[in-house]
Amino acid sequence: MNKEILKLNKIDQSVWIDSISRGMINTGKIKSMVENGISGITSNPSIFQKALSNEDSYDDEIKLLTESGINDPKKIFQKLSIKDISDACKILLPVYENKGGSDGFVSIEIDPKFSKDTDKSIKEGIYLYESINQPNVMIKVPGTSQGIPVIEKLISLGINVNVTLLFSRDMYRKSAKAYIKGLEKINTEKTDIRYVNSVASFFISRIDTEVDKVIDNKNKGKVAIWNATKAYEDYEDIFSKDNFKNILNKGGKAQKLLWASTSVKNPNYNKLLYVENLVAPNTVNTVPEDLYNEILNSEINYSSFKQSKNNYDDSEIIDNDKLNIITGELLEVGIKLFEDAFDALIKEIKNKIS
């Protein structure tokens, strides 16, 4: 166990890796990361697109699939990604079991083209969950208005959910409440509520990238952390109410906030800015490989969330209306980026089978 990751674990923060590929699995790289303290994996279309472009480790399976009569690029991608996620789940299963089902998850995203189609998202979420057939898989659902009922439905069926592309506190609160509604609808005679989990992926650095363009210099590099501290206040409020206490008494768990997009985009910022200032109990920080390596080779001097929050004056940090416009735009941009990455990976598969 790496001492810096252990330091975060002692505050009850998990560190996940925001990367996966067939090569990482086959070479033992993911296993090594888990030995260092990584306790979960997140994936998205961009990650899979890079894996397919940069590795030849998928080529033999693609050939076998086409020879078996599967020529639809999306179906081929589903087969490839389902295998990767299933294999990764098996590597992390001991973590999941040791943590009593509260950690050790691997996330896979619903087709981003379904981000605004509730019915198709539910159908695909169920398909992926049943196909992977591992207790520690999480289905990623975008935090759109159409995604809110998807969260509730999948949770009610006992399917773990990672709510992704959350930029605004409003959408975070809606996703947390959808999770609670889903738990309330679980048939406890068929599903053990103790093993139904969710994380809410709250994006960080992309906010500063956009907000820094329109605010005073004194607040540059601060708004994303401030926004996260306010979301954490929302988390504490939502999961302390009486209706959730009833769920807790039945064995249910609070939805964890997961800090996503935590590598700095501005080269002038400390590389650990969104690690050291986002340490809070019952949270996750998912990091790309370069930030993971930075953590391994650095000494983390973290601030408590209370300290981070006290650094900012709510009235001066940013106008709420302006922030809401920016976070709404970031959601749309995020969806488009994932759609484009999905199109690119489908094109990559077409090229491999032609």
Locate predicted features.
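Active-site-adjacent beta->alpha loops and helix N-cap segments on the catalytic face
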Residues: 24, 117-123, 141-155, 168-179
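Active-site beta->alpha loop and helix N-cap motifs at the rims of alpha/beta catalytic domains
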Residues: 47-48, 54-150
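Catalytic alpha/beta core domains of metabolic enzymes, predominantly
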Residues: 159-290
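N- or domain-start disorder-to-order transition segments that initiate the globular core
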Residues: 1-28
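Conserved, mostly hydrophobic/aromatic
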Residues: 44, 108, 139, 154, ...
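Glycine-enriched alpha-helix->loop->beta-strand junction motifs that scaffold or abut catalytic
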Residues: 37-39, 150-161, 195
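Flexible, acidic glycine-rich loops studded with aromatic residues
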Residues: 251-353
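Catalytic beta/alpha-barrel core
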Residues: 18, 135-144, 159-171
